[in-house]
Amino acid sequence: MTSLAKNLSAAAGAAFEAMGLEARFGEVRRSDKPELADFQCNGAMAAAKAAGKNPREIAGEIAARLKEHASVLSAEVAGPGFINLRVSDAALSARAEHVRGDAMAGAEKAADAAVTVIDFGGANVAKPMHVGHLRSAVIGDTLQRICRFAGDEVTSDVHLGDWGLQMGHLVTELYDEQPGLIYFDAAYTGPYPAEPPVTIDDLGRLYPQASNKAKADAARNERSQKAVAEMQAGRPGYRALLRHFIEVSIEALKLDYGFLNVSFDLWKGESDVDGLIPGLVERFKQAGLAEESDGALIVHVARETDKKEMPPVMLVNSRGGTGYHTTDLATILDRMDTLTTTPERMLYVVDQRQALHFEQVFRAAGMLGLIAEDKLEHIGFGTVNGADGKPFKTREGGVLRLADLQAMAMEEAEKKLSAANLPADMGDAERFDVAKKVAVAALRFSDLMNTRTTNYVFDLERFTSFEGKTGPYLMYAAVRVKSVLRKAAENGHSAGKVVVTEDAERTLVLQLDGFGAALLGAREKRMPHILCEHLYGLAQAFSSFYAALPIAAEADGEKRASRLALADGVRHQLETGLELLGIAVPERM
């Protein structure tokens, strides 16, 4: 069953076509003035301009045709040519029934579902994740959930940073501490121990030590450069260490990502495509796209139509090494060649400050024919800022670790729950579980509710509140609906068939009707805040419904059964939508 808005749009489009006008003028949406109408169609004004006719005349004829539609209670012309529509109680009742029993809670699969790779996360091996990783993780994971739900075949890839200078820092610092390790014997080629010689704590100590030394000593930095060059060239001991570093890091990363309910299909890194680079470079040469410049190999990607400077892609630098341009291109090649189903598009959820890099890479990929340039999308986002409007930092001015941010969220969630009226029989384990869900809801929703491309100010006290536009508020709204249904069941009352008769019921069903449009809008525009807005509106509509009408306490049995069924539909859509945002709802709180 399609949404009422979509159904009415199709009917209005057909009415415009019957008048010899384009169907696109028939778009119907929720009314800006709910006191006057449920839906509105504004297409008559644009159609009149195109046809050279009076807009009210066109609107009048369209309204007359729409009055014949089974769902329409009234169709009236207002102002210069607006068409105001009221739908029948029967149509709303049928729609609510469908939402309640539908696996997609009233949404529909996308007509343009595609095989999609979503590249997000981008954590670095041996480096702790920081607050800057929050947005990529949360936005990327939400997009993969939304896209899968809408019918896309999605493969998500964390795309680890495991091939840069930090690897050289680790190797050399480990050598300084334990020079006798077999990995440093250049004459030895294996086999190497299965157990890593380092822990995640070791990596967290070794890297900053080496990095600080390298910043103060050019010779020390040169040692790291030499070590990473030897690693990239295939030195067995260093490659074995790399595998250990990656293995240890992934275990730790899975904990950080897991806390946020973030998952990946692939845990690949830059090093996984190293073997493809020589062949890739040769392809660029054979295609006549690569040329030498000051000892480096570059690809010009600038176009005459460019209105900004577009530097060339650096395939191979003057020292013979490769960088992010090359590994990103090799990763595209790897995905196109090795994934079970060939990708039709790739989305890169990365800080918008990397826009130039991705534009260069996408152009080069298109020029070589790896994939059409317009099938590659950079999903950029703004920064997480402190109260001063600058990127969020610790009190000491350092970068805040993601694990510390999560601990802060847990502490604030516990504080909020301590002030709440929790069930007396709630044990420590359940309380901890609820606190974690509140913390995750706060972190994820506070990020997702903002337009992706904007910066936002991080305010943990506000984000963990059970009031206002927050994740915990939406979670509590869903729990409250579940509580109403549970208590009704305990008193022997069950849901029946939805029969809409009251204004508060109508408003609630009209909000339920918009879920599919919000879902597909969030998917199409890569903007999760669209779904957040819908769910917040639904929670508010239920709150108004709950305040206006008795539900389980309704004396009339049929009305009670109807309202319980409507509440169950709200529960279903709220939980479904929150799951798409990566927010789990507890049974009680």
UniProtKB/Swiss-Prot annotation:
One of its GO terms (molecular function) is arginine-tRNA ligase activity. Keywords: Aminoacyl-tRNA synthetase, ATP-binding, Cytoplasm, Ligase, Nucleotide-binding, Protein biosynthesis. It is an enzyme of class 6 (ligase). Pfam families: Arg_tRNA_synt_N, DALR_1, tRNA-synt_1d. Its EC number is 6.1.1.19. It is found in: Cytoplasm. InterPro entries: Arg-tRNA-ligase, Arg-tRNA-synth_N, Arg-tRNA-synth_N_sf, ArgRS_core, DALR_anticod-bd, Rossmann-like_a/b/a_fold, tRNAsynth_Ia_anticodon-bd. GO terms for biological process: arginyl-tRNA aminoacylation. The keyword Disulfide bond does not apply. One of its GO terms (cellular component) is cytoplasm. A motif ('HIGH' region) lies at residues 123-133. It catalyses: tRNA(Arg) + L-arginine + ATP = L-arginyl-tRNA(Arg) + AMP + diphosphate. The keyword DNA-binding does not apply. Belongs to the class-I aminoacyl-tRNA synthetase family. Monomer. This is Arginine--tRNA ligase.
